[in-house]
Amino acid sequence: NEAEPQVLYTALHHAREPASMGQMLFFMWYLLENYNRDAEVKKLVDSRELYFVPCVNPDGYRYNQTTNPSGNGFWRKNRAMNQDNTQGIDLNRNYGFQWGYNDIGSSANGEAETYRGESAFSEIETRALKELCIKHHFNIAVNYHTFGNILIIPWGYNDSLTKDNEEFNILAKDFTKYNQYNVGTATSTLNYQVNGVSDDWMYGDTIAKNKIFSFTPEVGPAFWPSRQEIGQINQQTQYMNFSAAWNAGSVAHIEESSPEIIEPAEGDLRLIITRTGIQDNDIKITASCDHPDQIVIDEITPFRLNMAETRTVKVRYHVIQSLAFQENVHFTFHILTGEYSEIIVSDKKFLGTPFWRDEANHTDYWSSSINRPLELNS
């Protein structure tokens, strides 16, 4: 369905980073095995187009498998022969945007591990991904690498931020909600520049194709993690993969930030709404409580937000029949935008009408003396 938001996942640009592929295969199997068992998985798959390239560099990966069948092969580049009889091009220095910008972020030396090749897109592997991106309309791309537990955003070729830095960071904050990866540009996370990389081209080239919000997660603690660490990596990247898929379309998140005690007659519940999704759509919120005969809640008019925008929404409630002292009230809020939805429950307490109340914003009801610094006027 061409109307469905499209997402690209890639792994193994570098041959010695198998955990990047392992977590992707784990995610793919999870979707397949749970499609008919988990309503959320089914809704995601039915409303998104997900494209997976688990091994961008098959020749390099096969070489490591041949030389080190038990693991720990450290060949990085592909296996192409260069004109100077050296071997291998770093595929993640071979993309066309700011290719060869300088010799700091990539190398002109064929023996170097960051050798960028004779020209931009000289390699069949990067040309294949270029054609894939031109053919499709990816809103988000996630190009997995190892290692370091970080999430890299453009730009890589220099130290400047993109004009969409706020949008990149709101997406990255959602991606890393649970794994808490460190987020930033290559310089801020790795302490060095990179040029000719996938993220810069996917985001920066808007002539050959659309703009893609492209990210590079560097997963795990090592190039060849232990068996136990592999399982941890697979779990830590699950939410990131789901978040990338959802955020390619319409997504808005909801939080509730009101006092625990509800007013005796009427009051407002404060909701904080943040749009993280790329596609614009109506945001619809419904509210209910477990005392519908005693508390009436006003309807909330649908609205829209810009990407990365946050808004506080006040939800008015009316207590039409008093509740018992200290009775618990559970409010349920449901947010829907496009196919994405969230439900949160907020627990409040009803205390009734107080005997006396002071907002403490002035001292009109108070007096002081030497022996009694502050006392209530009778």
Language-model features: where?
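Metallocarboxypeptidase
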Residues: 67-266
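Terminal connector regions
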Residues: 318-353
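Extracellular Ig-like/FN3 beta-sandwich strand-entry sites
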Residues: 266, 280, 310, 324-330
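Intrinsically disordered, low-complexity Pro/Gly/Ser/Thr-rich segments with frequent PxxP/GP/PP motifs
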Residues: 294-324
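Short beta-strand elements of extracellular/lumenal beta-sandwich folds
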Residues: 263-279
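Active-site-adjacent structural elements in enzyme catalytic domains
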Residues: 1-79, 129
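Short acidic, flexible loop segments centered on an aromatic residue
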Residues: 274-294, 334-335
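Extracellular glycan-recognition surfaces and repeat-rich motifs
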Residues: 355-378
